């Protein structure tokens, strides 16, 4: 359905469409959480259906290169992510035509990155900084504005413009290309693919509220598209930045083409996700859970200094709109109760069958390591009181940690308990059976009564568990 809709949009123009691709093409876990059944790579697979028609242009701003901007979810710089994306796309059989460096005003590191890409055989184009952008339309749509930018040579009908993250200049790249194509007599088109907010769901639908929670740091606000309402008398949802920029876009389209092909920001979109929802209540509940997860991310961020209080306040307001609290997350109360009764950190996990398992801090294991072991035993049908890892397998790791590696904490972390379990599995059928349950942990919900160590957080992430923590340091 989605790929066919994009083909229709290509045909509306001179067989040339510049598609601004928002959000994540790979590993879109937010979408998969709030839309159960939506695979994290759904957008990529959709694009692969258009592989013979599509080429990819990756945009990165010169400022992001200069400031070593980091992609939060992966912990790598934007310029490193450009190289990663190129490899990922090519590995999937998609054609990467070029990289465009936007907002360039002579930044040395951006020039060095351009040279590095060219040495790798990658075509690189430059879009220059335009004073007064995006308001100074007479300058922007002139030989001194878009006209100064490089014309990106493309060979296929669909040009997908993507980027490592927001603020990379994707829209500016598309509009600059429209200007240059028009100068060359080609009536190219522009469209936008954004999964969220979903335009044909109600404004206050939990799926759309979960998007607001996810972008609370950007101050994105969902709103009724006033231009669409005026043009068609129909209520649709868009977000504030697209609504605010639309008059400017419209004026740019009119300057280039004589008239705008679109009457509203919603018209520009090609997203069909809203038409694919078959169980609304499941999506509503999944989105409520996502809002709670985002709340915990925000308050944990306040504790470690990476987030603002305003972000948490905004998500709290969304929770009040949905009449939910943090304890509506099934693992929160069990983790807190276990921590209170033991007087030490504890954690809880909801298994695929809905049962909640807890883990406490002990002499040998940290709370998360104990939780992991308890969950695997439960899934394997092994009695809770049965030891499946001999103390003789744990003690050498403790000695290594404390005596040789200088650690003050002798308790095993999640990665270490998995290593001990793996070593034991060579001789123990129970350990082997427990280890085989690891794939079942994917998608399980975890809550900790304290903030996790980096190693525990990364282990749960690799296992595919969704983790939240109380904003308390151990």
Annotate the PLM regions.
Residues 173:
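Hydrophobic positions on the alpha1 helix immediately C-terminal to the Walker A/P-loop
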Residues 383-395, 399-409:
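Substrate-recognition/cap regions that form aromatic- and gly/pro-loop-enriched pockets
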Residues 1-161, 177-329, 333-336, 344, ...:
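Flexible phosphate-sensing "switch/lid" loops adjacent to ATP/NTP-binding sites
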Residues 364-380:
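A short, polar/charged loop-to-alpha-helix boundary motif
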Residues 165-166:
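The conserved Walker
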Residues 184-188, 381-387:
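Phosphate-handling active-site elements
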Residues 189, 361-362:
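Residue-level structural signal for beta-strand termini and adjacent loop
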């Amino acid at each position: 359905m989605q790929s066919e809709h994009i083909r229709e949009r290509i045909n509306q123009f001179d067989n040339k469409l510049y598609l601004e691709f928002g959000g994540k093409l790979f590993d879109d876990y937010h979408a998969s959480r709030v839309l159960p059944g939506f695979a994290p790579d759904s957008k990529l697979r959709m694009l692969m259906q258009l592989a013979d028609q599509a080429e990819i242009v990756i945009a990165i701003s010169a400022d992001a290169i200069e400031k070593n901007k980091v992609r939060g979810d992966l912990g790598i710089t934007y310029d490193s992510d450009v190289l990663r994306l190129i490899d990922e796309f090519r590995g999937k059989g998609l054609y990467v035509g070029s990289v465009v460096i936007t907002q360039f005003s002579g930044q040395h590191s951006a020039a060095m990155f351009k040279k590095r890409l060219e040495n790798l055989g990658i075509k690189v184009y430059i879009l220059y900084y335009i004073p007064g952008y995006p308001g100074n339309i007479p300058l922007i749509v002139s030989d001194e504005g878009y006209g100064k930018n490089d014309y990106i040579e493309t060979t296929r009908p669909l040009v997908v413009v993507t980027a490592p993250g927001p603020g990379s200049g994707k829209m500016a790249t598309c509009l600059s290309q429209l200007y240059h194509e028009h100068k060359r007599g080609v009536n190219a088109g522009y469209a936008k693919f954004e999964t969220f907010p979903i335009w044909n769901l109600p404004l206050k639908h939990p799926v759309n509220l979960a998007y607001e929670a996810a972008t609370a740091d950007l101050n994105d606000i969902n709103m009724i598209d006033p231009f669409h309402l005026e043009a068609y008398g129909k209520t649709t949802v868009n977000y504030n930045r697209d609504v605010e920029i639309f008059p400017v876009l419209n004026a740019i389209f009119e300057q280039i083409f004589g008239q705008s092909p679109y009457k509203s920001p919603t018209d520009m979109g090609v997203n069909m996700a809203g038409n694919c929802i078959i169980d609304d209540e499941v999506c509503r509940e999944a989105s409520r859970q996502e809002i709670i997860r985002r709340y915990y991310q925000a308050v944990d961020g306040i504790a470690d200094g990476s987030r603002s209080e305003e972000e948490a306040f905004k998500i709290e307001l969304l929770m009040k709109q949905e009449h939910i609290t943090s304890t509506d997350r099934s693992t929160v109360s069990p983790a807190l109760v276990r921590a209170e009764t033991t007087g030490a950190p504890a954690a809880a996990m909801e298994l695929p069958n809905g049962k909640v398992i807890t883990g406490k801090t002990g002499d040998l294991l940290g709370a998360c390591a104990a939780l992991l072991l308890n969950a695997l035993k439960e899934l394997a049908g092994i009695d809770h009181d049965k030891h499946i890892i001999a103390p003789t397998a744990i003690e050498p790791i403790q000695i290594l940690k404390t005596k040789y590696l200088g650690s003050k904490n002798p308790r095993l972390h999640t990665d270490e308990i998995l290593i001990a379990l793996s070593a034991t599995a060579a001789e123990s059928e129970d350990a082997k059976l427990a280890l085989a349950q690891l794939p079942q942990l994917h998608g399980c919900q975890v809550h900790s009564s304290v903030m996790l160590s980096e190693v525990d957080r990364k282990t749960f992430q690799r296992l595919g568990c969704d983790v939240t923590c109380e904003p308390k340091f151990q």
